[in-house]
Amino acid sequence: VDYFTAVHIGTGVPAGTVVCGSDNFMATTKFDAHFTGTAAHAGAKPEDGHNALLAAAQATLALHAIAPHSEGASRVNVGVMQAGSGRNVVPASALLKVETRGASDVINQYVFDRAQQAIQGAATMYGVGVETRLMGAATASSPSPQWVAWLQSQAAQVAGVNQAIERVEAPAGSEDATLMMARVQQHQGQASYVVFGTQLAAGHHNEKFDFDEQVLAIAVETLARTALNFPWTRGI
């Protein structure tokens, strides 16, 4: 692959704006933590139990207390906690679904390492076992300047586009397409991430999320122009 472009809509970018070199995606690691304790009768023999639910709860609080990094933004979130089997049973199992993020790969790795320490510490505190399983990851985005300039030149010709800019100073999430971008660039290709602005009824991942469908036509025409007008014989 010589040229690669990923696209998104929204993310706080206003309608009529196309960001042709989005570089604010955070590196991220997604993982599950499986806690295994010992079940016991909660009324008759509670001392025989090793409470996986309490270990997971302690880990959750510790994860959200990880210190920030001086070199950039970081994030951690426990999105799911599942535990236990019955109200009269000391919980023998618990599951946490966790993600870490960082403005760079280094910062994300720092948060991830601290997260592993917190989880292991909570497991030790309650005398339970824990296993973490990697579920996904992405790197930070670093668009290729020449490709960004070409995308800007094409987006600027599309009706409904008020401005085609290189980047924005705004927070974003993470994006697995960054791994494909990095792979293309490692093989001397060029890559970028384009965000098409649109009005949103509610933020991303909100149950009331909706968008103005005019952005779809703008995106399709931009991508069409990018391919149809490209100087294939000489490249850029």
Report each predicted region and the residues it spans:
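Histidine/acidic-residue-rich, glycine-tolerant segments that coordinate divalent metal ions
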Residues: V1-V76, V80, S85-V89
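Metal-dependent amide/peptide-bond hydrolase catalytic core
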Residues: L53-I236
